[in-house]
Amino acid sequence: MSRLFRGATIVWVVLRYGLDELVLTSFQKPWLRLLARIVSFGRKLDAPRGQRLREALERLGPIFVKFGQVLSTRRDLLPPDIANELALLQDRVPPFDPDVAVATIERAFRRPVGEVFVSFERVPVASASIAQVHFAIVRDRHGVEREVAVKVLRPGMLPVIDNDLGLMRAMAGWVESLSADGKRLKPRQVVAEFDNYLHDELDLIREAANAAQLRRNMERLGLVRIPEILWDFCHPEVLVMERMKGVPISQIERLRAAGVDIRQLARDGVTIFFTQVFRDGFFHADMHPGNIQVSLEPGSFGRYISLDFGIVGSLTEFDKEYLAQNFTAFFRRDYKRVAELHVESGWVPADTRINELESAIRAVCEPYFDRPLKEISLGMVLMRLFQTSRRFHVEIQPQLVLLQKTLLNIEGLGRQLDPELDLWSTAKPFLEKWMLDQMGPQRLWREVKAESPHFAKMLPELPRLLHDYLHHKPHDHRREMQELLAEQRRTNRLLQSIIYGGMGFVLGLLALQFLIRIRFFH
């Protein structure tokens, strides 16, 4: 009954904001297009379609807002006006009752909140659709009191999410089966990705592991602070981490007044991102201004502070090679190489005409070179390449789409800090170093080091293995030769039987004919 009521609510919102005309007018069947005209008759929709879609998602609640945020990253699928509007969605919901947060903590740790924390601030400092954050003080295993941030999962979310996802899957299947444009947008695939994303966010242990991995990777870089996870106080519904104190990166004038080098800050952000991408293959994929602060503390003045690790991206060596060579070929205007990279990736259908793909890529990329390098957006280049590839039915991998969205965020943030930021000059050393590492002796040395434990295990066994091989191989060879000779003898005997039998048959016929003739003449 609740799903039926929720479905009716969704239909009402769709009609109220005129979203039906976005879908029904693209249907192939004439009667459906006629239905669209009848439904929209006499209705005045003054707002643009992107704005109406955004307002409808906000009306449907936090799960649909989340869906819109995730959908806004798929610029390879969406028209620009819709993607830009969806990017404005804010995940802001009222905080839930502090008593509920306390009950969640006590249920997770099976003891009163006063025994878990030295002190706990009941008023949350931040609230979103999935969780909210409280400040607290905890005594660690060494007896030291530490200021921490406590992230508590919003209770009762799983049934709500599963209910809305079920309706989304039904709508996606309906749109994909009836509309050619809908099928091209792959709604069922998008909903499936959103399903995985939401269920990942519901497990705070996974987020804690992401934070710990990024902290370990970034420790020696010295440009970013990532909170330490207090694993003794973590649970799938509760995440406790070091409290970070900084100024939101959007408050540029406050940072400048404090003496922070804003231009260097812009370059540091790009350096952090490309280090995560090309060195580690593991990057923070939700680096919008709300998740980034800047430290003003003496020991870490001017460093980035990174927060919220629910969304991360992972890249294989193949993904990194694809990116590095694409960027390099783009700046060399080697569009044939860009097309070849798509072919080598294995994502291009077998019947694709490479010369047509190259021509389409040239049409996308060439206009960028009328601008100074500092005005070229690598994120936009990737996005346009993905859009062009989609026309040729190239399947772009989700991790690369996630990286493209993150790169756009980094570029936007960097140019907000420093409008003169030349992203290519900052990225080029990373690409060159990565390609040198892949083709030079360093890669060979890394592979030797990686395999050395295996070699060390096998080394003591080599003399015995060699002895066994030399001892058994002659016997094996002799046995094989004996079997071959025996088979040859059997074959020879068979051939002899056939030949002798045939000769006997022929001689018998000749003898019979000779006898018949003798009788005939006598």
Curated annotation (Swiss-Prot):
GO terms for biological process: regulation of ubiquinone biosynthetic process; ubiquinone biosynthetic process. Keywords: ATP-binding, Cell inner membrane, Cell membrane, Kinase, Membrane, Nucleotide-binding, Transferase, Transmembrane, Transmembrane helix, Ubiquinone biosynthesis. One of its GO terms (molecular function) is ATP binding. GO terms for cellular component: plasma membrane. Its EC number is 2.7.-.-. Residues 119-497 form the Protein kinase domain. CDD domains: UbiB (cd13972). Pathway: Cofactor biosynthesis; ubiquinone biosynthesis [regulation]. It is found in: Cell inner membrane. HAMAP family: UbiB (MF_00414). The chain crosses the membrane at residues 496-516. The active site is at residue 286. Is probably a protein kinase regulator of UbiI activity which is involved in aerobic coenzyme Q (ubiquinone) biosynthesis. SUPFAM superfamilies: Protein kinase-like (PK-like) (SSF56112). NCBIfam families: PRK04750.1 (NF003404), UbiB (TIGR01982). Belongs to the ABC1 family. UbiB subfamily. It is a single-pass membrane protein. This is Probable protein kinase UbiB. ATP binds at residues 125-133, 151. The gene is ubiB. Its main location: membrane.
